[in-house]
Amino acid sequence: MHCLAAGSVQGDMVMAARIFGDQVGSTAPVFLAFLAVHVLAGLTAVVTGAIAALVRKGSPLHIRAGRWYYRAITLVFATATVLAAMRWRQDYYLFIIGALAFTAATVGYLHRRRHSPGDTGHIVGMGASYAAMLTAFYVDNGPHLPLWDRLPPIAFWLLPSAIGAPIIARAAIRAKHATARSRTGHDA
C-alpha cells in the first residue's frame, strides 16, 4: 500500500493527491503542513464540542470543553482560510462555511459572557457553529467515506443542520424553561 500518490501538476502545486487512501488537494509541503494542523484542530473541535454539549451546563468540564472548542474552531477557520486561499477555485465554499462556523461560535461565546445563564444565544451560536463545521467536513469528505459515498451530494449540505436544528431547538427551549422555573422558584 502506498502512503502517498501524486496527481497532476498545476502551477507549483501537485493536485488531487492521495495520502493513506484519502484524496487531498495538494502534496505541496506548505499545504500539507496547514492541512495537518487543520485536521488536528478539527478533531479537537469535534471532541470538545461534543463534550460541552453533553455534560451539565455551567459545570467546570462544560466551561473547559467549551473554551477548548472555541480555540479549536478558531484554528480550524484560520487554517481553512489558508488552505482555501491556496486552492480558491476548488475550495472557496469551505472558506464560506468556515467563516459561518467561526462567526456563530464567536456570537455564542460572546453571548454567554455577556448574558445570564439560560439565555439561548449561546446555545444557538455554539450549536450552529458545530453543525456548520460538520457540514464543511461532510461536503469535503463525504464522497470519500464508506456509506456516505452512497448519499446524494445534497445530503452532505443538509444532514448536519437537519439533525442539529431540532437538537439545538430542544436545548434552547429547555434552557429557557429552566431559567423561567428558577426565576419563579418552581422546580417542577
PLM regions: where:
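Alpha-helical membrane insertion/targeting regions
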Residues: 2-188
